[in-house]
Amino acid sequence: MFQGEVPDGYALVFPFEEAANRTIHMLFVRVPLDVLWLVDDEVTKVETLRPWTGIAHGLADTVVELPSGAADGVEAGDTVEIVA
């Protein structure tokens, strides 16, 4: 929140115990973000959210926030490997 930019290669990962409807909002976020909703490492939804007003929901056991444009070409059904 309140960051003016998101560094290249940055990802914020939110793991959850089980798959459920997860809501992401952009209140107080100043830059657009690409968001991936994953279930068992499979993408269920991809969306670019706008600063301040964006909101979206999706089924996920993991949610990944990325710099805008980082998820270009990623589609529902793709597999994502999280490497820490």
Q: What is the predicted role of each segment?
A:
Residues 1-84:
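Compact, glycine-rich, soluble single-domain proteins
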